[in-house]
Amino acid sequence: MDTVFYSDHPAFEGEDCEIRINGNEIVISYSDSDGVVIYKGKDEGNGHFVLECPERRGRATLHQIPTSKFLEGFWVEDGDKGFWRITLP
């Protein structure tokens, strides 16, 4: 997973994350310096996911082109915001 921030925070590249997609539900989990982070959401249609992480006041979107191995989107969490890109296995 690659994460880019709007602030001067350096980007995270190649970070490990777990992706589970089951029907129209999606769960993304990863670890950071504060512990495990879990975003859960649903496919709103055609690979457009809306996710939340209530513990971090996080909201996110992820989008997937049908033949792509990537999920890409925007996130907001505890006042920070940026973009992320996840490579599917």
Located regions from the model:
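Central antiparallel beta-sheet cores of small beta-barrel/beta-sandwich binding domains
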Residues: 1-89
